[in-house]
């Protein structure tokens, strides 16, 4: 609604609109702080040797966060794993994603742990039952006209595209 029309509205309606807007802003701010705190808690798992239950919790958190971010941007949101994240952590989380989506179908490919050549120096993501290089996937999505955003997970931080200020390190 344009400001020119807003000023002609009755006082009660203007106050309600302002109140609703401020309430939405507070809710958004609260969610961003909750996401920031959760990211901070989960980033500590990337530096240690997490237990299977901690890896499961990390996987569920990242999946939920990706769903939320995808809804906020009205597009696909994937988890980009930087090369500095220990292989045992990122592959375990991707295995968990695969199990949730497909069960044990094609699990042999993911369990081999040698999906990508060791000399590959690229960030990876799990998409549609496959572990793929992000650069190759970006080229494919661009050619198809599909917009995608990433939650970037590195050894020291989890970065979301929600707010560029939310970089937890």
Curated annotation (Swiss-Prot):
Interacts with and disrupts the function of host retinoblastoma-related proteins RBR, which are key regulators of the cell cycle. Induces transcriptional activation of E2F-regulated S-phase and G2/M-phase-specific genes. Inactivation of the ability of RBR to arrest the cell cycle leads to the stimulation of viral DNA replication. Keywords: Host-virus interaction. Residues 9-22 are annotated as: Binding to host SKP1 protein. Interacts with host SKP1. Interacts (via LXCXE domain) with host retinoblastoma-related protein 1 (RBR1). Interacts (via LXCXE domain) with retinoblastoma-related proteins (RBR). Belongs to the nanovirus Clink protein family. A motif (LXCXE motif, interaction with host RBR) lies at residues 110-114. This is Cell cycle link protein. The keyword Cell division does not apply. It comes from the Viruses. It comes from Faba bean necrotic yellows virus (isolate Syrian SV292-88).
């Amino acid at each position: 609604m344009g400001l020119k029309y807003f000023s002609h509205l009755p006082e009660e309606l203007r106050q309600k609109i302002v109140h609703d807007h401020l309430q939405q802003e507070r809710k958004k701010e609260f969610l961003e702080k909750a996401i920031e705190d959760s990211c901070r808690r989960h980033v500590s798992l990337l530096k240690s040797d997490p237990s299977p239950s901690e890896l499961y919790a990390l996987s569920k958190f990242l999946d939920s966060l990706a769903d939320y971010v995808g809804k906020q941007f009205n597009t696909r949101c994937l988890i980009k794993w930087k090369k500095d994240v220990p292989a045992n952590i990122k592959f375990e989380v991707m295995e968990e994603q695969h199990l949730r989506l497909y069960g044990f179908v094609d699990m042999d490919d993911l369990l081999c742990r040698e999906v990508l050549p060791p000399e590959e120096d690229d960030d990876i993501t799990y998409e549609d039952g496959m572990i793929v290089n992000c650069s190759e996937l970006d080229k494919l999505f661009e050619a198809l006209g599909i917009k995608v955003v990433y939650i970037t997970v590195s050894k020291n931080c989890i970065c979301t595209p929600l707010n560029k200020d939310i970089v937890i390190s």
